[in-house]
């Protein structure tokens, strides 16, 4: 009865199942566990093609909530004639943004400090409006009376500001538009070294009657996975909604298309975001004001996440102002937490967040000391192994004793043959005599599993690993080892671990144990180098611990035999 090997066999079988499932998804076939969260094989939608031609991608603006219905406006001015469409490029030290004067919407964002994977001189493009990607930031006003319309993301705006490059600590990009008796001034304020943008909507009632507009803040994206998405490990691409009541809620694009997404519809706090591996875009509306959240499919493979809130009644000649914040950039947990409560949760460590967050904090602290994320991973692995050393020692002692009695165990199997009842009784008697716990090598491993899984997600999800070098040939811990040296080292360490363990008496189990390094090592060929580095260090330390403990037990046994 070897429960430890049974558990290892279960882990091995499940890993093969996951590997096959990812291969199915990679080849465009249905997932074994249901519909994939986002279809990377979807054909370009009509909305994407329209956007590439300079047209508005969304066929209509949001409807007005019932509470914000407007009254008749006898003196409202007609919408101005269409202005020339213009694209405005502005830049800071960390962002290069492109605005379209149609709707004063943000249609392209380049992250200057984050190169594209494999192209160090090309910045990552997070937002874009092209045949390959539709991902834009929009806002506007609804609730105009008598079939008129307030300025929205389809309305021609005029560029008012003149500066296109950050020279001081902040840069303002200002647009204006008049429609439906409402003059709207939209101001984007960018800051040095920051990815959060202050967005101000100033409303002036130029009509002869009160107006009651509602402001919508909208993110629009196609449902395709990012171009650099791996088929060998899953990362989330979709929408996230946060509120103090329901906390963090993730919704896949496929669930939005089916109308199945579960999220808070009415709230007076929180934010909404579109999330992908390492990066996010989020609207943070004014806190303390009631709003409606909407997630919808506006066209095939084109989705919108928006928040709509009533501005209140604006009297003739009066003005109103709504201040919001926009995040466009990496999933920097510290910076995001300073922008809005819970915004750092877009870095989703899953059900092991309670363990993962302290691990990330410790990893960040080690990086501040060592100045290198690769060495920080090595140091963190050493610390974790040291903390779990008592458990590991108990496990290795149990395995060493099992190895010592392996010949006797084989003799019992030959003696009792197919009589399983007598064999089990004899094995239990031998375990009692030798003071061996059959579960002794298994339970310590089980206790450590949640910590190692949490660390796996920390290394996979943390944007700090992206573009971070280690030594020599490893120039980016977030991509696979270009020369496959680390996966080869990992396979070698796994073979050594197997050699140190008792040989399974069952020939089939023995063959499976020898195949496991090839399977897991083969998977690691496609995993980020930071993860493989962690496994290599972990395995190396495990081998050193096991060899030391086994040698000590052998010496004690030899000393006892020589007395």
Curated annotation (Swiss-Prot):
Major location (coarse): membrane
One cellular component term from this protein's GO annotations in UniProt: plasma membrane
Ranges for region Disordered: 36-68
Gene this chain is encoded by: yidC
Membrane-crossing segments per the record: 6-26, 373-393, 443-463, 482-502, 512-532
Family the UniProt entry places it in: Belongs to the OXA1/ALB3/YidC family. Type 1 subfamily.
Protein name: Membrane protein insertase YidC
Gene3D superfamilies found in the cross-reference section: 2.70.98.90
